[in-house]
């Protein structure tokens, strides 16, 4: 069952043209360089844990099957500990993807997904349990769900909702082969047993969307997400999912399309989880823009979509990570992904809302320009001091290892950088398998 809503568009092409003030040089630090022989190649972002600890995953691909790692700050340095290395055998997971960022539950358990492996080769959802306090033992990994086949196209992470339920999506499979959103319920009363998977909604590939590419848990048990394709114009859509009142347990959820993208400079192919801001406003990214959706007022009506900033034809490429919305500003990463011969490795950017009346133009500041071998990608976080922490796909000297970086929007940076330029002869072909278009 689904409800499809006609859309209110305020994003005419004229709104896609924005001013941009001069790039400000800000404090940049390379905090830690990964080595593929210890943690696996290609880091795909970090998430915060307790006491300043960061957790993340490596994709593997060129170097093994990937891993889950911990980064611990101490005395101005960061120490990496590999918590678990995937084997790709005997039902274990193998390799992660662009959005497969783990989540850290309140009990310290880590949950995440892999693209391959599992009991049927279609990927898996895993749980990592920390050792008993003070024991110093290893983390314990369990595969809590295996996707039935490789056709499921599991490229998502999972998010946690009420009662420990995990939600996620696949870009394939479902009743129509266009992707689906699923729920994983833990064993009853937290004891031993089997997690239960349930399909909440299957996309048809029509105006309801196709190939989900981001999911966020909202208040009241509602889910918000984006679909890369489909919608009224075939360029992607933002959707809402919620249980149907009075429906029996296990019934499909109701989908409502909140916004359909027009394509081109007006935005196309959304990617990444929407961010819920003040007043229920949704913020998100497409391959070439940052957008916002404003919910209807108390009198009802449609959601109103507008483009905040267009990256159309910019040298640094489009947004490549979930954005952060803090104190009226938006922070994100841009990258060309594999475009290492284009003379840019992407950027960390800041978008500031207009100071004047509503309807003014947002301004963009490039906080840091990355060299061509870096390719910032995946989730990143803001620490308690307002600095941004993230990872890159590539590392110094053109390696696939990546590094952890810090960008401080409030401090000045000299023109010199401690990144190393890419060596000659590495251009050509798609350097990274982590392409955001996956179908």
Stretches found by the model and what they are:
Residues 2-439:
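Extracellular beta-propeller repeat domains
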């Amino acid at each position: 069952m689904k409800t499809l809503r006609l859309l209110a568009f305020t994003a005419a092409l004229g709104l896609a043209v924005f001013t941009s003030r001069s790039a400000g040089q800000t404090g940049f630090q390379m905090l830690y360089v990964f080595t593929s022989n210890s943690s696996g190649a290609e880091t795909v972002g970090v998430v915060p844990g307790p006491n300043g600890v960061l957790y993340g995953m490596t994709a593997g691909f060129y170097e093994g099957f990937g891993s889950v790692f911990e980064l611990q700050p101490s005395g101005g340095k960061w120490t990496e500990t590999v918590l678990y290395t995937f084997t790709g055998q005997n039902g274990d997971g193998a390799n992660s993807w662009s959005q497969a960022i783990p989540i850290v539950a309140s009990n310290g358990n880590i949950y995440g997904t892999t693209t391959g492996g599992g009991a049927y080769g279609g990927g898996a959802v895993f749980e990592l349990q920390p050792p008993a306090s003070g024991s110093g033992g290893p983390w314990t990994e369990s595969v809590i769900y295996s996707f039935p086949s490789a056709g499921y196209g599991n490229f998502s992470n999972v998010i946690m909702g009420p009662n420990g339920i995990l939600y996620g999506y696949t870009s394939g499979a479902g009743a129509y082969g266009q992707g689906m959103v699923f729920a994983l319920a833990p064993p009853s009363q937290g004891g031993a047993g089997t997690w239960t998977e349930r399909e909440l909604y299957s996309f048809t590939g029509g105006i309801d969307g196709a190939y989900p590419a981001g999911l966020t848990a909202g208040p009241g048990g509602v889910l918000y997400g984006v679909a890369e394709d489909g919608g009224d114009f075939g360029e992607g859509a933002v959707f809402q999912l919620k249980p149907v009142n009075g429906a029996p347990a296990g019934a499909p959820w109701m989908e409502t399309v909140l916004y359909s993208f027009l394509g081109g400079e007006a935005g196309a192919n959304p990617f990444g989880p929407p961010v819920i801001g003040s007043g229920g406003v949704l913020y998100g990214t497409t391959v070439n823009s940052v957008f916002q959706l404003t919910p209807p007022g108390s009198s009802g009506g449609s959601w109103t979509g507008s483009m905040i900033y267009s990256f159309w034809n910019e040298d640094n490429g489009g947004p490549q990570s979930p954005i952060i919305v803090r104190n009226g500003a938006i922070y994100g990463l841009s990258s060309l992904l594999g475009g290492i011969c284009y003379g840019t490795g992407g950027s960390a950017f800041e978008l500031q809302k207009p100071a004047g009346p509503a309807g003014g133009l947002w301004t963009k500041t490039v906080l840091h320009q990355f060299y061509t071998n870096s390719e910032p990608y995946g989730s990143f976080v803001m620490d308690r001091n307002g600095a941004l922490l993230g990872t890159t796909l590539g590392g110094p000297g053109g390696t696939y290892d990546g590094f952890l970086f810090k960008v401080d929007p409030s401090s000045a940076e000299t023109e010199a950088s401690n990144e190393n330029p890419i060596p000659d002869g590495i251009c050509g072909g798609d350097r990274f398998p982590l392409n955001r278009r996956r179908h």
